[in-house]
């Protein structure tokens, strides 16, 4: 089976990329092999949490064009026992004997505001999951143990400029509807 490499990198601020830069400089991380970067920022985790986009912009400055096909998923809010960090995922060309961690990723087309939280989103996510499973060279969906989704939500601007009615005019409620549609898409994609 294909193999993967994961690094957990503590950060001191949404734009702190020193740990990521060190891994690259010391040749312990190859940006060309990145599949995804997940992160936790100090933000509030709500619709207006700017720290997610701030962190993504900082990652893009460090990695440049290498982020073009990399899923960048930031989650705001580090209350309680959580601390800010990045988790990098690389797909390696190596194979191992027996089971190992394999990764695949797909980035869907941008959904229109009127598609967020609808069956169109469910179908789009389902196809993306199937594509990611194929790219990970996994032949049996029973071997899939985790699917990470970055799902869109409605903002006031997206609602106001939508060419068609949206499922809700409540930006906070759109988070739940989008997550629900994405979750159903994962289930449909895995059978």
Model-derived features: positions:
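Terminal domain-initiation and capping elements
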Residues: 1-191
């Amino acid at each position: 089976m294909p193999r993967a490499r994961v690094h957990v990198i503590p950060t001191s601020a949404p734009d702190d990329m020193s740990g990521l830069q060190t891994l690259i400089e010391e040749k312990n991380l190859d940006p060309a092999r990145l599949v995804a970067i997940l992160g936790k920022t100090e933000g509030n985790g709500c619709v207006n949490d700017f720290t997610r986009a701030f962190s993504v912009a900082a990652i893009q400055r460090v990695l440049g064009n290498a982020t073009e096909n990399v899923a960048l998923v930031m989650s705001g809010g580090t209350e309680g026992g959580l601390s800010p960090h990045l988790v990098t995922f690389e797909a390696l060309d190596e194979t191992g004997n027996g089971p190992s961690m394999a990764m695949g990723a797909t980035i869907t087309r941008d959904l229109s505001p009127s598609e967020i939280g609808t069956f169109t989103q469910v179908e789009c996510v389902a196809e993306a999951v199937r594509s990611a499973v194929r790219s990970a060279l996994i032949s049996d969906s029973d071997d899939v143990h985790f699917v990470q989704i970055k799902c869109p939500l409605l903002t006031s601007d997206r609602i106001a400029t939508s060419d068609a009615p949206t499922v809700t005019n409540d930006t906070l409620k759109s988070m739940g509807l989008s997550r629900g549609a994405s979750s159903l898409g994962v289930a449909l994609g895995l059978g």
